[in-house]
């Protein structure tokens, strides 16, 4: 349909529509649209229809908006306004690729439209279409050479494309146009100079970068950045004496910065350990209260010199009462010799302080205050916990608590000792005690909630967090709004442990949405950072966003989700009622009565909680509705609700698992778990070449990893030994690669070789034992013997590995072996007396945990039992 041009009156109204949109006066904009469209001559005016659609989209009426914009576009296909509006609509729905196409169509009809070019450049940088971004920024520079954003955007395009020299030239040309006095300090000009210097450094032009820094030093506001950069550049240019002077100056600014001592070491190049120590001894004299110059030498000293320096360091900290001293020394615990020296010194302090209130009976000087002994005991509790002696650790911390029962840090350490010893429920109880001492401390509150989640006390954890969340909304919803990912990952883990897979997946998907939101949030900074010239931070932001899913929170959520989807594929959820009936069929009358009572109590409790939850939800919905009515600027509709039941009964669990796996394969290639999870998925999909690829990538990271060994045996056995309908090409590739990985052998021999090579490692023995049973179920007895050995000579005979062995005995990885599992549990209980996993049957049922002294539920249950 040919375009209809508006007469002056309607054209003036149309301009008012545009102004209303720009000023977010959407209701007024709709009135003006109605005035134009009510005229029969202009009822189908494309641009007005498009603008009406765009305005409605801003009011949340998405379907109507799309219908109007498409109608407008059909009526005027050659209108840049219609195409631009359609692009804006797609952009609001995060369909950036489609929006880019719309903008390109708009530019066909108005190639020099500044607004469309700017919008296009934003989408290109968002989607990292760097070549396209450079072209668009060049067009903007040609059209508006006087605007600084045009120059800066063009320079950033070259910087991101790693054409540093061109970026530096553009920035220099732009800098020349900036009229600033050499003595005047202007923040934006300062940031421009620092960004220009960063580009020169990344280009490897260190001499030019140093000259640039010295020339414009007076005009740069960030003096610290100038000195730090100068130090790095002088080191790069081997001007070591000058670099040493710079780092000494930086130490005067902040004697507690580790990086300055490292820089000074590089500049002075000490020939031996004594010369290296001399650097720090000078700092002791200069900064007598400095902790870092006393701590860093402990990393490289050994023997008597280490003991001498450590003695001074510990005395200073214990006298002052410095709680984090153990965390400061934690990295030294990799060295057994240093651990022995630490223990000797601190145990000596404790003995001496008890007898004469001095660190050493031969010391001269005034006596130490009683708190010094407290901090020594506090340290010893953490020390023995770290070296795996929880009984001694508990003795020390209990003594400390008896002397000072109001110190929160002591309860925190006691909780940690129980956690590391394997009793997370007792740990949660003690963390709750700590929280009760200071209910206004958010850190303790969060720690307590985290321990409760680890103990699968989800409701209690939610109640704990609710003390610091917004009123009128549920704690869980508010924590999700705040993107509180530590809470959600722990929640997901707890639900997974309780086999509530739907709830766990909901948390994993919520975390996935947070990362999508964080990626989308960068959109606002593309224009803001160029306007404010915060260019260094902006480039760092872009680089961070590119590797965002490397973050541990995402990896943890993805791992939990993949594990659940694999379980759902292996054992799809069935009708729970039928399973429940099968379970109760074998119960005695007394047991059945007890169960029914328990079910009634649980049902009553659930009903009360549901009513409470519904009331909260109604209140929350009222608040949200009010907020929505007040806010006419809301864009887009609500997100799809995550329903646990629906998530747990997904039809294609492996495809869902791949969605979480893909970012890990792209960004977390250095973690072996990424490739082993990939193998587990492709093994179930029978994608042999992808299985092989995963194994090879994992092999390159750690060829002797126990889990990798299991994957290799399964691949070997499935692809080569079992007959499969494989194409000749695939079979040939598999055989060639398998020969490279395994050599001329069979799975059994390969497993035996692996076992001989790693016979002193418990995790490796467990993997080999699983494969012994997998390859030959008749060898079950040998497999169990291999896995359940608890010799002291074995490496990694720790709590975690022993729990994995017990799980393998229960889950069928070593066949049906309940008797062997019970014997192994009893043996492990002697080794790890505090661990819940190895407690006698019925122990957990007898153990009750109350949160902040609330034992009403326990009393009610006891009454019902009677």
Swiss-Prot record:
Effect listed in the UniProt record for changing residue 834 to F/A: Reduces NatA complex stability and reduces catalytic activity
One Pfam family here: NatA_aux_su
Residues spanned by motif Bipartite nuclear localization signal: 612-629
Illness association: Intellectual developmental disorder, autosomal dominant 50, with behavioral abnormalities: A disorder characterized by significantly below average general intellectual functioning associated with impairments in adaptive behavior and manifested during the developmental period.
Annotated positions of the N6-acetyllysine modification: 262, 735, 756
Compartment(s) of residence: Cytoplasm; Nucleus
Name recorded for this polypeptide: N-alpha-acetyltransferase 15, NatA auxiliary subunit
Listed Gene3D superfamilies: 1.25.40.1010, 1.25.40.1040
């Amino acid at each position: 349909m040919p375009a209809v041009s508006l007469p002056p009156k309607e054209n003036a109204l149309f301009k008012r529509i545009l102004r209303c949109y720009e000023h977010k006066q959407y209701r007024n904009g709709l009135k003006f649209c109605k005035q134009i469209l009510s005229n029969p001559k202009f009822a189908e005016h494309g641009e007005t229809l498009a603008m009406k659609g765009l305005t409605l989209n801003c009011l949340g009426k998405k379907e109507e908006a799309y219908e109007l914009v498409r109608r407008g576009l059909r009526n005027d296909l050659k209108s840049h306004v219609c195409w631009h509006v359609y692009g804006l609509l797609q952009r609001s729905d995060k369909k950036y690729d489609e929006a880019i196409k719309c903008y390109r169509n708009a530019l066909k009809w108005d190639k020099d439209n500044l607004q469309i070019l700017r919008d296009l450049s934003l989408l290109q940088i968002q989607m990292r279409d760097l070549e396209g971004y450079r072209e668009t920024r060049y067009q903007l520079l040609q059209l508006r050479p006087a605007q600084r954003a045009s120059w800066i955007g063009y320079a950033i395009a070259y910087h991101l494309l790693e054409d540093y020299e061109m970026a530096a030239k553009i920035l220099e040309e732009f800098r020349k146009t900036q009229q600033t006095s050499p003595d005047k300090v202007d923040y934006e000009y300062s940031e421009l100079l620092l960004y220009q210097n960063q580009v020169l450094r990344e280009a490897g032009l260190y001499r030019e970068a140093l000259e640039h820094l010295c020339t414009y030093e007076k005009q740069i506001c960030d003096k610290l950045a100038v000195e730090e950069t100068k130090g790095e550049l002088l080191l790069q240019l081997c001007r070591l004496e000058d670099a040493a002077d710079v780092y000494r100056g930086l130490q005067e600014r902040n004697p507690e910065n580790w990086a300055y001592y490292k820089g000074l070491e590089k500049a002075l190049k000490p020939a031996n350990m004594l010369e290296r120590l001399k650097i720090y001894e000078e700092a002791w004299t200069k900064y007598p209260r400095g902790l870092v110059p006393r701590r860093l030498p402990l990393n490289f000293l050994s023997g008597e010199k280490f003991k001498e320096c450590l003695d001074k360091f510990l005395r200073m900290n214990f006298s002052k009462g410095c709680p984090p001293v153990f965390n400061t020394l934690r990295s030294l615990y990799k060295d057994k010799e240093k651990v022995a020296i630490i223990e000797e010194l601190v145990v000596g302090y404790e003995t001496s302080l008890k007898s004469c209130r001095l660190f050493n009976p031969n010391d001269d000087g005034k006596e130490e205050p009683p708190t010094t002994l407290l901090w020594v005991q506090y340290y010893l509790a953490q020390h023995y916990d770290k070296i795996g002696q929880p009984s001694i650790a508990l003795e020390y911390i209990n003594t400390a608590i008896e002397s000072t029962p109001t110190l929160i840090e002591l309860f925190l350490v006691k909780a940690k000792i129980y956690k590391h010893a394997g009793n997370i429920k007792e740990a949660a109880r003690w963390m709750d005690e700590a929280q009760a001492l200071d209910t206004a401390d958010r850190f303790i509150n969060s720690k307590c909630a985290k321990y409760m989640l680890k103990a699968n006390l989800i409701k209690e954890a939610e109640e704990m967090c609710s003390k610091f969340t917004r009123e009128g909304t549920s704690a869980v919803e508010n924590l999700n709004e705040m993107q509180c990912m530590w809470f959600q990952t722990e929640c997901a883990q707890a639900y997974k442990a309780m086999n509530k897979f739907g709830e766990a997946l909901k948390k994993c998907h919520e975390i996935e949405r947070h990362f999508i939101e964080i990626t989308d949030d960068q959109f606002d900074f593309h224009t803001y950072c160029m306007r404010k010239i915060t260019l260094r931070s902006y480039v760092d932001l872009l680089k961070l966003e590119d590797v965002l899913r490397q973050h541990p929170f995402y990896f943890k959520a993805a791992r939990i989700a993949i594990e659940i989807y694999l379980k759902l594929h292996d054992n799809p959820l069935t009708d729970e009622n039928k399973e429940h009936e099968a379970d109760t069929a074998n119960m005695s009358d007394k047991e059945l009565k007890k169960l029914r009572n328990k079910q009634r109590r649980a049902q009553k409790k659930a009903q009360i909680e549901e009513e409470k939850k519904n009331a909260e939800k109604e209140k929350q919905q009222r608040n949200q509705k009010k907020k929505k009515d007040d806010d006419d600027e809301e864009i887009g509709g609500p997100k799809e609700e995550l329903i646990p039941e629906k998530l747990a009964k997904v039809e294609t669990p492996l495809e869902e698992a791949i969605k979480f796996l893909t970012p890990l394969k792209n960004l977390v290639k250095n973690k072996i778990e990424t490739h082993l999870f990939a193998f587990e998925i492709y093994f179930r999909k029978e994608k042999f070449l992808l299985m092989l690829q995963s194994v090879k990538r994992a092999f390159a990271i750690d060829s002797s990893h126990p889990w990798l060994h299991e994957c290799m045996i399964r691949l070997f056995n499935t692809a080569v030994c079992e007959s499969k309908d494989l194409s000749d090409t695939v079979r040939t590739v598999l055989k060639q690669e398998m020969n490279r990985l395994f050599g001329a052998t069979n799975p059994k021999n390969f497993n035996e070789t692996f076992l001989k090579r790693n016979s002193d490692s418990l995790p490796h023995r467990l993997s080999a034992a699983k494969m012994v049973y997998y390859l030959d179920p008749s060898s079950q007895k040998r497999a169990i013997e291999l896995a359940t050995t608890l010799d002291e000579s074995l490496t990694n005979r720790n709590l975690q590995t022993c729990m994995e062995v017990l799980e393998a005995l229960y889950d069928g990885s070593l066949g049906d072996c309940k008797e062997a599992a019970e014997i192994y549990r009893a043996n492990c209980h002697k080794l790890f007396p505090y661990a819940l996993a190895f407690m006698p049957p019925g122990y957990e049922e007898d153990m009750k945990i109350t949160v902040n002294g609330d034992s009403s539920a326990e009393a009610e249950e006891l009454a019902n039992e009677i």
